[in-house]
């Protein structure tokens, strides 16, 4: 994993300004409220390496975060739980919504270094890591940041769109192919490594993230979905959309329904799966 991760050194931090359709995003919206739902399952794994947190604060902000741990034994579990707890604690220092982008950018570096420095009970390097998706909202504004292959979706007008990218070797291969640095044959020869992560917390030198420096403006009834890869590797976008568009149920019921369907469709192996839903409405 670390060998593949080392390949990302030539990639710099990304601000989402291309490859994402921003045409449907505008500055409309009223001071409505956020409804929350969350669910996490262990799947068929022996242990839970996902960690999540979501809460509303008195200052009007809502914080949502999911980390998907990686590493043998308890390495991934410790990495994800450490990252979530530290982020939640550090977020207490944010007093104004305008501070969020800078906070998130600096926090990712801090979390990366902290997870990289984790040790096991014998003082050996833990060797674990975790992905990160984090969203902060206030009113109809939203900031986010991500590292790894957990996703953030926006559901609007019967459409679903991921607003961040999977930071895996496929992303790098696609870029190299597009720039003429490799041939299609060379691409195919390396495609078996496509899902190896090239960015995650715990690398110790993280430099690839997706984020926004200007607020993403929500419209009434927009839904934000944060999830670990256990969800989208089992359910298609269409299947996810069919479930979350159920306006007759609460976000909590829908979050639980997503994971219930995941397990219903599981025939053999299912990864830990975590989801957080935030609906901006009345």
Say what each PLM segment does.
Residues 1-282:
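PP2C/PPM-type serine/threonine phosphatase catalytic domain
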């Amino acid at each position: 994993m670390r060998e593949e991760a080392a390949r990302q050194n030539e990639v710099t931090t990304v601000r989402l300004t291309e490859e994402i359709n921003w045409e449907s995003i505008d500055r409309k919206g009223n001071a409505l409220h956020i409804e929350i739902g969350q669910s996490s399952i262990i799947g068929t794994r022996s242990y839970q390496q996902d960690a999540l947190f979501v809460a509303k604060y008195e200052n009007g902000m809502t914080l949502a975060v999911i980390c998907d741990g990686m590493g043998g034994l308890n390495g991934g579990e410790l990495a994800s739980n450490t990252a979530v707890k530290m982020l939640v604690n550090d977020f207490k220092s944010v007093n104004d919504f305008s501070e969020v982008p800078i906070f998130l950018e600096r926090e990712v570096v801090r979390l990366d270094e902290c997870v990289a420095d984790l040790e096991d009970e014998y003082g050996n390097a833990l060797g674990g890591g975790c992905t990160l998706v984090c969203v902060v909202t206030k009113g109809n504004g939203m900031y986010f940041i991500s590292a790894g292959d957990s996703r953030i979706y926006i559901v609007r007008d019967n459409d679903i769109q991921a607003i961040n990218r999977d930071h895996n070797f496929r992303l790098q291969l696609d870029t190299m192919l597009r720039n003429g640095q490799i041939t299609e044959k060379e691409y195919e020869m390396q495609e078996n490594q496509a899902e190896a992560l090239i960015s995650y917390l715990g690398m110790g030198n993280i430099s690839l993230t997706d984020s926004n420096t200007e607020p993403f403006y929500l419209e009434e009834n927009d839904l934000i979905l944060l999830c670990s890869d256990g969800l989208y590797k089992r359910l298609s976008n269409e299947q996810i959309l069919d479930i979350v568009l159920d306006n007759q149920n609460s976000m909590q019921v829908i979050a639980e329904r997503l994971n219930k369907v995941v397990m219903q469709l599981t025939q053999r192996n299912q990864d830990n799966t975590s989801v957080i839903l935030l609906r901006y409405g009345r």
